[in-house]
Every structure is written in structure tokens, then in C-alpha cells.
């Protein structure tokens, strides 16, 4: 049983301490209570109950707890490749939904980068694999009237909340969205997209206006990568998903950090080639790719059928079928592993 105890970075919008679990109205709040600390503890208690019942087991049950699942999985590399610990014959990770996930899309993360020649204060989001729930930019103070005139319209168009603050000799425009996992970007509201929409409508003639124009042409609010020519799909896993998780300025470079979930019949290199082709002449370049290819365990395999039958029997839902998801779980770390629960 594979689980993880690391978490995605926290935004500043928590109403309680995210690292001090708190029960409110019968629900447990804290970073990672669902992903994946709670499910991992549930599995530990389940095995403890089996042990207390004295049930005979034909196989040994092993728990593997990682702390690098949300980033680059160095924990799995260390455990299996450096320490040379034998992999289990079959496994599940309680890091998704019931009844189970038999196929996971590929995860392709990369950056779109452009050089700038002037000072620019622009930032937003926290990580590749989360929908950005905040983004802000500094603007000249002479823009105040036109910004205030358009605030309500921008909120209506983008579903973001906008705030304008006076600084010493400039204005800070902030967009607030709704965070979500990059595997399901439609469940969130991307503040970076909202901010770029607003900036693109301002009468600016500078690097910022160029960047906003690029964003709206090649990305915008589309969640399938159509503007970059990567709106791919297949019968097994559906459409590619596209998320802008972060924007930052470093060393006179503007960097957008992107996360794609790639249909299982495509390879990440195919996506890269399409993006590079479409970026030609845009002023932006493709950098720092990191690919985790898809997995697909056959529906008729013993592992899938055993877990599926267990779920159907316990829950009483004989019509439940295995699912495909864009999330990336530890199921990819092993040859015969699926995500099973815990939601």
C-alpha cells in the first residue's frame, strides 16, 4: 500500500492553520487530510483491524510512505532504485477515488519563457500542479481611472475577484480565483488567466502588454491547449487538460509554468513538438520539460477485477466501473499498481 505525506504548497486563503488539524462542523480541516494523509491512516487502521481479528494472510502487507509525491518522486527512486528494495507483486495507492483508477494520463510540465528589457513586477500561483488562485501586477498610476471603470466587467467575464491597491507611485492589480488540482482545472478559477485578460484590455504599450497579448492568443481561458495546437484526445482517456500554475519574473525573464495531463495513447514528446511548432515567431520559447508518461492497467487484469469486486460487494453497487483520471499517483511507480479510493 503506497501513500504520501507531503502536500501541495498552501495559499494564504485558509481560515485556519493548514498544518494544525481542526474539526469544524464535523469535518477535519488541514493540508493533506484528503491528499493523502487521511486515506493512508485509514489503510493503517484497516490493517490493524485485520491483525486484531487474527485473519490468516497468504501474502505480506507492506506500507510504503513517500514524502516527495507532489514534486519529483525522488523518494520512490531512492527506495526502489538506489536501495534496491524489491517491488511488491501488486499494489494500490489510496490517492484517488472509488471504485478505482485503471489508467492515468501522462503528466507533462514545462515553462513558456520570454526575455524582457524593462522592470516588471508580475507574479501568481504557487505550483505547476495547482490552478492559480491569486495573481498580481504593478501598473502605472495613470491607469487608475480605466481600471476602476472595468473592474466589474472583468469580474463578470473571468469569475475572478479583482482588487486595486495604491502603492508608493504605482498601482497593484490583484486577481483572486479558486484553487484546484491541475488534473481537473475546470473545477477551479485561474487567477493568472483573469489577470492577463484584464491587462490585455488596458491601453499599455510596453512589455506587459506584449505578454498579455501572447497569453490571450495562445492560452486564454481554454483548458485543452488549443491555442498551442495540443488539444489532443483519445477514446480511453478523453481530452488533454491544460493548466497555468504559476507566473513569475526572474532575471529579466517572464516565466509561465504549465501542467498538461496527456491522453494515454499519446507521448509527452508529441506534445512538446506541437508546442514548439506553434510557438515559432511568438517571442516565447519552450523550456525545462518534465515528463511522466501515462499508465494503463488492463480492465480484465486480476488486480483491477479483485479490487473492483471488493468495492462492489462492500458498497452494494454492482454497476460500478473502473475509471480513467488525469491525476498522477504512486501507481506509476510500480508495474502492477492502481489508485483505489479513498473518496
Where are these regions (language model features)?
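Histidine/acidic-residue-rich, glycine-tolerant segments that coordinate divalent metal ions
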Residues: 57-188
